[in-house]
Structure formats: structure tokens, C-alpha cells
A protein has these predicted regions:
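Positively charged n-region of N-terminal signal peptides that target proteins for export
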Residues: 1-6
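Bacterial N-terminal signal peptides
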Residues: 10-27
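Extracellular/lumen-exposed scaffold segments
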Residues: 26-187
């Protein structure tokens, strides 16, 4: 091979490799998503502000990517990871039991029996009491949401994400309802 031909060949080969890399880069870089990518969560309070000495609710809205599901709180099998929400209440606050929605029984190719799952948009509700001693102003209630997201092909590792419920506390007379579409009794 003549030097000029070798340079041309090397340059052409490099161009082809670059073109193939660009064409297939999305496939080469595609990764299995994480549980954090599959479920996007938002936190809302039923009162804005909430009244000192009163009660309110916190809603955690889970938006689950199409094609995925998470196990419901009432799981179908012992080995499954149930959806779980925990709160760490600061001084001046107490809370009740989390209200989980009823799951849907779905059949998947990997299981012989239907599984109790959440799909799409799911709302978890946590009742909270702001005691008469609750500090006024912006307060934070740390939350931890644990779930395991699965598709029909794979289950991702269990995921625990920290969330923050930001609540403004005012005198009881200033309390006003907020985000009622998330807290109506029909949901």
C-alpha cells in the first residue's frame, strides 16, 4: 500500500468508526434506569398555612413511568418489597398512620398469580397534627419513601428516596385549605 493510500484508508476508516459511534451511541449509552428515574415524587400539604394546634395532611404523589409498576402496600407475596412511607416528626408535630391507596391486581408474564401493584399516579396521605407548641413559620418534616419498581422484563433494586414536606405554620385563624384536588374524599 502506498503512503498516500494508507493515509486515505486510515482517514476513511476513522470517519466510518466515528459515524458508527454516533449512530449507535444511544444504544451503547443506554442503561437500565434507576428507581429514582422511574418514579418521580412530589410532596404537598392540605393547608397553606397550617394552623398551630390544628391538623392537616401531607400527600406524596408518586408518578410512575409508563411500562413500570411498584408493589402496593399490601404486597402479594412475602418476598416482594412493599411501598412504604416514613416520617420523622420534629418537635411540635405528631402524625398518624399513612393512608395507602388500594392497589390493582395485574398479571405479568413472570408471575403465575396476579400481583397487587401501583401504576401511573398514586397518592399516599399522611395525617399530621401541629401541636399548640409547634414553631411558627416554615417547618420541615423529613420523609423517606421506599419502593421497588419493576417492568415486565426486570425489577430494579429497592429504592429509598428522601423527601421534604415543607409546611408553613401560622396562628389557627390563618389556616387555609390548599391542593384540595389531592385531598378530596373521592381520591
Amino acid at each position: 500500500m502506498k503512503p498516500a493510500t494508507a493515509v486515505f484508508f486510515a482517514g476513511t476508516l476513522t470517519a466510518y468508526i466515528a459515524a458508527i459511534t454516533v449512530l449507535f451511541a444511544p444504544a451503547l449509552n443506554s442503561q437500565v434506569p434507576s428507581g429514582k428515574d422511574v418514579v418521580k415524587s412530589e410532596v404537598f400539604a392540605s393547608m397553606e398555612p397550617a394552623g398551630r394546634g390544628g391538623s392537616f395532611q401531607i400527600a406524596v404523589v408518586m408518578n410512575i413511568r409508563p411500562g413500570f409498576h411498584v408493589n402496593a402496600r399490601e404486597k402479594s407475596d412475602e418476598y416482594l418489597i412493599a411501598t412504604d412511607l416514613k416520617a420523622q416528626f420534629p418537635s411540635g408535630f405528631t402524625g398518624g398512620e399513612v393512608v395507602y391507596p388500594k392497589g390493582q391486581l395485574e398479571t405479568f408474564t413472570f408471575s403465575q398469580k396476579p400481583l397487587n401493584v401501583y401504576q401511573g399516579r398514586v397518592i399516599l396521605r399522611l395525617p399530621v397534627n401541629a401541636l399548640a407548641t409547634a414553631p411558627l413559620g416554615e417547618q420541615h418534616i423529613p420523609l423517606k419513601l421506599r419502593y421497588q419498581a419493576c417492568s415486565t422484563e426486570l425489577c430494579l433494586p429497592p429504592t429509598t428516596i428522601p423527601l421534604d414536606a415543607t409546611i408553613n405554620i401560622a396562628d389557627a385563624s390563618a389556616a387555609k385549605p390548599a391542593h384540595q384536588e389531592l385531598f378530596s374524599s373521592k381520591r
